[in-house]
Amino acid sequence: MRNNHIVIMAGGVGSRFWPLSTPEYPKQFIDILGCGRTLIQLTVDRFKGICPMSNFWVVTNAAYVDIVKRQLPDIPAEHILAEPAARNTAPCIAWACWSIKKEDANANVVVTPADAVVMNPEEFRRVIGNALAFTDNNNAIVTIGIKPSRPETGYGYVETSLTPNPSPKGEGNEILAVSSFKEKPDHETAEKYLKAGNYLWNAGIFVWNIDTITNCITKYKPLIAEQMDKIVNDLPSDSTCYTLNSKLEEVFPQCEKISIDFAVMEPASKDAIVYTHPADFGWSDLGNWASLHDKLSKDADNNGAVGNVKLFECNNCVVHAEDAKKVVLQGLDGYIVSEKNGQILVCKRSEEQRIREFSAE
């Protein structure tokens, strides 16, 4: 446990949840479920018992550092990594892993987004524990694959072998070899994936030991590795690699803007070192209002609401009005209603893909 580290990626802006989520205060820092905890706090909660608080790391936008400190006061301030520029997930993860390796050469690491929802944290911890045991004993990358319940077109997929991995050291009987990664499919292809039985949703949660990931980045993206050496390893002994400094501000924005999936996962899967742990712990990436409606408790008319909300003759609505003193709605069918800081959205659920357009007006 003392060598386990958790990296939380918390730099996104969550523009599909406007007006709840804004560039100044995005969804990972909001109590979007109305449970008294923000999404990033829930993320930390579900990892408790897997590693000490001193081994948590957060990579975020420089503008959000103070929010992270307020919401997660037990995480060491030097473990809050402030990106000077958004360069997608590969440089973000590389920076965190190079920083961890400098502190703990025997680290075993879990990387997770800050804004996912897990309804069964006990099962989540069991799955993560299995994956950590596997990567502790193997030169392997494990991605958590969610067992699909529907032909979802909004997620990427992981194609797996149909039998457990052939030669694990230590625990790993539930872990399968990954054949390939698939981009978000159309509905017909998603139907085929569901019927095939060997495709899982890619949850964007990764587990590896520190040598495996740093070696992979060095092999597949050597320039990013060189840049991380400059940022983390080439600093003078009295400096810090965690806060904004001249070396970081100079080098990090030069990193290739690329996801960890394209930078590492796809080439590593061709080298047969990528595995997946199938899981069913009530996961959602909470990427849109439809997914929030799915996770909220519903009344008899299929309405989900957060806040002091009164509904009359309403059906199939999702309402979030935590800041408002009281919201009363009548006669709506299939609407999103949201209020935050004096801004109000009323939108048909069938038109939610236009919310970014509306918020830009």
For each feature predicted by the language model, list its residue ranges:
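Short coil/turn connectors at secondary-structure junctions
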Residues: 2-4, 53-54, 76-77, 104-107, ...
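Conserved core of the sugar-phosphate nucleotidyltransferase
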Residues: 121-168, 172-239, 243-249, 254, ...
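Conserved N-terminal catalytic core of the sugar/cofactor nucleotidyltransferase
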Residues: 1-9, 15-23, 33-113, 119-129, ...
